[in-house]
Amino acid sequence: MSYTITAQTRTEIGKGSSRRLRHAGKVPAVIYGAGKEAVSIEFEHRSIINIQTNDDFYNSDITIVLDGKEVKVRVQAMQRHAFKPMIEHVDFKFA
């Protein structure tokens, strides 16, 4: 199964801006690896909350549409809220 997430590049980084994103219903994330420079991104929480329940989500390539360009990634790590059904942050690795 293929998964697609639409994302935007983040201009602000840090704890305060990440908290503002989460309150706005977005998830801060980063894409890194493969000798490329790390890219900070953000996307809607609802675009990942349901698809992350599938087991193959963590083992398959995911397409991120980042500012109009398609990027193939894999989930490296995901931080979840302690008791709420919320994703706090996602680390993606270039596929």
Swiss-Prot record:
Keywords for the protein's UniProt record, in alphabetical order: Ribonucleoprotein, Ribosomal protein, RNA-binding, rRNA-binding
GO cellular component: cytosolic large ribosomal subunit
One term of GO molecular function: 5S rRNA binding
Source domain of life: Bacteria
The keyword Ubl conjugation appears for this protein: no
CDD domains (UniProt xref): Ribosomal_L25_TL5_CTC
InterPro entries: Rbsml_bL25/Gln-tRNA_synth_N, Ribosomal_bL25/Gln-tRNA_synth, Ribosomal_bL25_short, Ribosomal_L25_dom, Ribosomal_uL5_bac-type
Family membership noted in the UniProt record: Belongs to the bacterial ribosomal protein bL25 family.
PANTHER family: RIBOSOMAL PROTEIN L25/GLN-TRNA SYNTHETASE, ANTI-CODON-BINDING DOMAIN-CONTAINING PROTEIN, RIBOSOMAL PROTEIN L25_GLN-TRNA SYNTHETASE, ANTI-CODON-BINDING DOMAIN-CONTAINING PROTEIN
Assembly and oligomerization: Part of the 50S ribosomal subunit; part of the 5S rRNA/L5/L18/L25 subcomplex. Contacts the 5S rRNA. Binds to the 5S rRNA independently of L5 and L18.
Described function: This is one of the proteins that binds to the 5S RNA in the ribosome where it forms part of the central protuberance.
Identification of the protein by name: Large ribosomal subunit protein bL25
